[in-house]
C-alpha cells in the first residue's frame, strides 16, 4: 500500500503537464503500476481511487468481467476508458450475487460521471470505448448502469448496454435502466442497447435536466432493440433537455404496455424552459409493439429527414397528443399512420411518402428491420440531404449507415443501406417510349427523357431535359428516347414535377385520360406502319381513352388539336432536322394521314410520308 500511495502522489505531480496511459486488468499483473499490460493495475484498487488520477488520463482495460462494487465512486475528472477489441470483451458487470441476471443484491450503477462542466466546456472530456455494461439492478432513485450528471462533454463509442433492470418506480426519478443522462451532453456512436427494462420512463435511456441550457444527446449509428417499459418510452424517454438527435439509428422490437402513454420513443412537449427537440435523420423506428413508434405530448417538437417510421396493425407511426410546436420535415421520409390534435395536417414535403398503407409488413416484407427495407424507393441524395439540413446545425456524420456501410451518392431512407424499389419500361426498335411514375427515378444509361412544351402545326417541341444519370421528379410524364431494350429504373422519393409547360400527362394505373380543357384531344404513342412512330389520336375523334399504367399521353386543345398525328424521328426537337430522302413516285400522305393528290415535284414545302418514309420538301 505504501508503494501505491507513492505512485499516486507521483501521478498527481505529473498530471499538470501531460496525460498518462494506464493498463488495467481484473486482478492486476506484475508490479501493478499500470505502466504496461504486464504490470496492469488491479481494477478494485484503481476504481476505488479513480479520482486521484489526472484529468485527461487514459485507461486501457483488458478483456474480462469487472464486477463493480455496490457503491461505485462518482468520477469527477475527464478520462478515457478503452476496452478490449480482440478476444474476451471488457465487461462492467453489476452481478454481485453471481446468478447471471440483474436482481436484488446487484450493483445499481456501474459507472457514474459528474464532471460539473457545462455544454461546450472542453476542460474535461470523458470518453468510453468498447465496454459492455450489463446486469445493473436499480431499486433506488436516479440510478442507472451509466449515470451522467452535469457533464458537458461525454463520448460513448462502440459500447453495449444489455440486461440492465430498473425496478424502482416511485415519484418521477426512475427509468432509463441502461443510461440516465441528467443535465449532460453525451454523444453515443456505434452503440447497442438491448434487453434492458424499466417500469417506465425509458426502458433503455432516460434524458432529463434541471436547466433549459443543459441536456444534449446524440445517437449516431446506434441500435436500440428488445427493451421494455410499461409506459413513457420502451426505448427512450425525453423528459427535460435541449435536444435529442437520432441519426443513422435503428429502434425496433421494443415493447410497451397497452395502456397509458405508450410508445418506443416518448417526449414531453416543449415549453418556455425546455426545447425538447427531437431530430430524426437517416433512421428507422419500426416494429415496436404496444403503442406508437413515437409519441409526443402537446407541443412536441419533432424534425424528420430521410427516415422510416412505420408501425403494424394498431401501432401508429407517430402520435402527438395535442398540437405540435413543430413537426418539420426536410423530406424523403416513409411514414405510416400519423395522428395529432391539430386542425390542419402537417406540412409534409411532396418527397415524403405518408400513407396508412405504409406498415412494417409492406415496407420490410420478410426482412427484419436490421436487414433494411424490402420495398422502399431511394431517399435523398447526398447533396439533397446536405441542402435540406443546411439550417438544422447537424454536425454528425451522415455518410454511413448504422452498420458503417457507405451511403454513396444516394440510398434508401432509414438506417440501413438496401436495394431500392424498381420500375421498368421497354424501348422498342422505334427507339421511343413513354413513362410515368408517382415516384421519381434515376434515368438509366443510354436513355434521355423529354417533356413536350408545345405543338406547332405538324411538329412538337420536345425538351430532352433529363439525361442519363439525372434524377427525374416524381409524377413526371416523359417521352423517352434511347437504345432498344427493357430498362429497370431505381425509384426514388422526390419532389413532384412542377413542369407546368409539359403537355404530357400520365397515370400510375390503367385509367381514362383527362384534361383541364373540356375540348381537349388525346394522343398516345404508337408506331404507324406508314407514318412511323409518333403521337396519334387514340380513336377517330381524338376522344379520351384508357391509358395504360405508367404510360404517358399527350393532351392538346385549340388549333393544335386539329392534327391527328405528330410523327417523331428521333431528333432532339421532334420532327425538325429530318434529312431529305430521294424522291420517288408513289402515294403521298401528309402528317394527318390524308392522301395528297399531287406529284412530289408540285408539293408545297413541308413534311410528307412517301413509301412509308418521311420526306421534307424544301
Task: Describe each PLM feature range.
Residues 18-45, 65, 369-370, 376, ...:
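Right-handed parallel beta-helix/beta-solenoid
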Residues 122-229:
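Right-handed parallel beta-helix
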Residues 78-141, 165, 197:
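Right-handed parallel beta-helix/beta-spiral solenoid domain characteristic of secreted/periplasmic
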Residues 455, 571-618:
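C-terminal outer-membrane/trafficking sorting elements
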Residues 70-80, 187-189, 207-210, 216-390, ...:
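Predominantly extracellular beta-rich ligand-binding scaffolds that present long acidic/polar faces
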Residues 25-62, 403, 590-600:
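Acidic Gly/Asp/Thr-rich repetitive segments characteristic of extracellular carbohydrate-active
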Residues 420-443, 467-531, 539-575, 617-618:
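A short, polar beta-strand/turn micro-motif
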Residues 55-80, 87-90, 322:
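N-terminal extracellular ligand-recognition/capping segment immediately after the signal peptide
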